[in-house]
Regions:
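Short, acidic/glycine-rich phosphate-metal binding loop used to engage nucleotide
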Residues: 57-64
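Cell-envelope/extracellular polymer assembly enzymes that use nucleotide-activated donors
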Residues: 6-8
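Active-site nucleotide-sugar/metal-binding loop of Leloir-type enzymes
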Residues: 69-81
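Catalytic-site signature of metal-activated, phosphate-bearing donor transferases
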Residues: 65-66, 72, 92-273
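Acidic helix N-cap motif at the loop->helix transition within catalytic regions
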Residues: 18-22, 42-51, 94-95
Length: 276
């Protein structure tokens, strides 16, 4: 049993009562947990109080910084390391053990982490595993700034990734991403994301910046009808999504639909611009 892991966990939330309790329960060994709330109207604040963790309310003014960067700039952390975690992301014992070991002796200033997705009630071992950079040293950087106009209603960094100065490592033990809110919520959420992505691409087509290799490939193809089918083949065939049965097929199909929506919305934006 590992106790007092010297990492500050930050959980940005809004109305996450269904998953927040389980998420916090699994973080017992962490030295500090801070929940940053966008004025939830459900029982989320009471759940944070029950677990005796720090509660911070965030009110977005529509400008930079958004929630994660605002927290990095305005909330004092007890520890050298910060881990950003969503309320539907659950740490495992293996992850906690590996985390405690790697941060105790490393020259890295951040770590990539793999995520296993649960989709339609099934924990997906194949397909296209999610990978993020949510763990880094405080002061080593922050989430990228992406200029936005009125088309963005997101108060938190969703598409933005941390820009860090230093070596980046890898933690092999995954975090479990378990979304309990069903397909309707999944489709609505990705509809919002595709709108954001289309507008952002049209506003600023030079995405070379400090992108990962995968992101550079994505933005070279995103203005093409081919990206959706290519991504389906990548998820379902090359990454073994077919081994997951109907859930693997649906997962890959929804990913294909997402990129179709981005391209279709790009065409709509251009049509509207031509008529102005």
């Amino acid at each position: 049993m590992i106790n007092n892991i010297p990492v500050t966990v930050v959980i940005p939330i809004k109305n996450e009562e269904k998953t927040l309790g389980k998420c916090l329960e699994l973080l017992e060994e962490f030295d500090e947990v801070i929940v940053v709330d966008s004025s939830s109207t459900d029982k989320s604040p009471e759940i944070v109080k029950h677990f005796n963790r720090t509660y911070v309310n965030f009110v977005w003014n529509g400008l930079f910084p958004k929630k994660r960067n605002w927290t990095l700039r305005n909330v004092k952390f007890k520890n050298e390391w910060v881990l950003f975690l969503d309320a539907d992301e659950f740490v495992t014992d293996k992850f906690k053990q590996e985390l405690a070991v790697v941060i105790s002796n490393t020259n890295c200033i951040g770590f990539w982490i793999n995520y296993q997705n649960e989709f339609m009630g099934k924990l997906m071992k194949h397909g296209a595993p999610m990978k993020k950079l949510p763990l880094f040293k405080v002061g080593s950087g922050e989430y990228e700034y992406i200029p936005e106009k009125s088309w963005s209603k997101l108060d938190m960094e969703i598409h933005e990734h941390p820009v860090l100065k230093g070596d980046i490592g890898q933690i092999n033990s995954p975090i479990i991403h378990r979304d309990f809110r069903g397909l309707t919520h999944y489709i609505q959420k990705h509809n919002e994301y595709s709108s954001w992505e289309a507008h952002h691409y049209q506003e600023k087509k030079d995405h070379s910046g400090e992108l990962t290799y995968q992101q550079r490939i994505k933005y070279k193809l995103i203005d093409s009808w081919a990206l959706g089918p290519l991504y389906f083949c990548y998820c379902y065939i090359f990454r073994g999504g077919f081994l997951e049965g109907k859930e693997g097929f649906m997962w890959a199909a929804y990913k294909m639909q997402y990129f179709f929506n981005v391209k279709a919305k790009l065409e709509e934006i251009r049509m509207q611009d031509d008529h102005e």
